Structures are given as structure tokens and as C-alpha cells.
Amino acid sequence: VRTDGGDYAAILSVEGELTSFAFDADGDLWLTVVTPSGGALCRARHDSWGTSVEQVVTQIDGAPLGVLSAVETGPDGKVYFAVSTEAAAKNGLESALRTELIAHTGTGCVYVYDPSARTVEQVLGGVAGAAGLALSEDDRTLYVSDLGNRCIWSVDADARELTAGGKNCGSFVSGLPGY
């Protein structure tokens, strides 16, 4: 993949299931990967010397990441990523989401990684199958798709430690068709 529209170039191969990717303002590729042992937020860089891929976040507070499902980058360099559920990662994203739809545990979370500070903070918890992320055109609102609750939550992109459906977490769209 080349952001400049040039020739195709294979820049990486990943072990596991690539579940989402997004380019940041610098042209770096951020991706979420799920392996049987857990998830990883990775960054791939490509320049005239070649490609480098690094696992940036693989655990939070000493616990391995669950099943990662989505990534979105902001113009300020911050990287938002979703853990769909705390269900076991060994069978991949589809299996984890199916399990969440049946069990409805609401253990999905959205985090933000700040590359300049090298910190991870929780933005939103209590999501029943976080499956997608998007920033508004003005980059002030983060949208989170919630498969289990069949809705899209909207939160301030700078908010921290919110709960799905709680204070300062609005339902942008609800009653979506689903399971």
C-alpha cells in the first residue's frame, strides 16, 4: 500500500487476523491485530530504507489486550482503538463478536493512545461489541458502533472514563437492525 498512489509495495505481513487499519497524518499505518494470545495495536512505517512494524500496545495495566476490532487516527496524532470484548481471542474477531451478542457482557472498551506521551487512556467502557470507530469532520466527536446495543454512541473525543449510555455519552443512532 502506498499513500502517494505509486506502485504497489507489500509493506507488512502479520501473524494473526488483521481487523482494522487507518493512516495517520504522517502517512504511518496503524493497525489492529488479533492472535490467539491477544490483540495488538501496531504501527507500520515505510520510507526509502524499507518498512518497519512495531507493536505499540499489547497490554493495559499488565493484562493482555482482548479482541481488537477498530482503529481511528486523529489529526493531533492520537490513535483511538476498540477492544470489542474481553472474550477469549483464540478464535478471532468474528467468534468474539458472536459470543458477545449472545452473552451481552458489555466488556468492550475504547482507548486512546498518545504517541508523544506514550500513554493509553480509556475513553469509553461498557460497550457490548465495539465494532467500529469514526471521528467527526471537526475531530471533536468520536463515534463508536455497538453491535450488542444496536446503536452508535457519540462522545467528546477528549473525554475519558465514560460508560456507554451513561453521562456525557449520547446515542447518535439507536435501534439499528441487528441480530
Give the positions of each predicted feature.
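Beta-rich, blade/repeat-based domains predominating
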Residues: 14-33, 61-79, 104-109, 123-141, ...
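A short beta-strand motif characteristic of beta-propeller blades
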Residues: 6-12, 52-61, 119-124, 166-172
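A short loop-to-beta-strand structural motif that recurs across blades of beta-propeller domains
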Residues: 1, 17, 40-42, 108-111, ...
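Asp-box/WD-like beta-propeller blade repeats and closely related beta-sheet repeat scaffolds
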Residues: 35-75, 81-89, 93-98
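Conserved beta-strand positions in repeat-built beta-propeller and related beta-rich domains
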Residues: 1, 23-24, 29-37, 79-89, ...
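Short loop/turn segments immediately following beta-strands, especially the blade-tip
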Residues: 44-49, 155-162
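Beta-propeller blade signature
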Residues: 43-48, 101-115
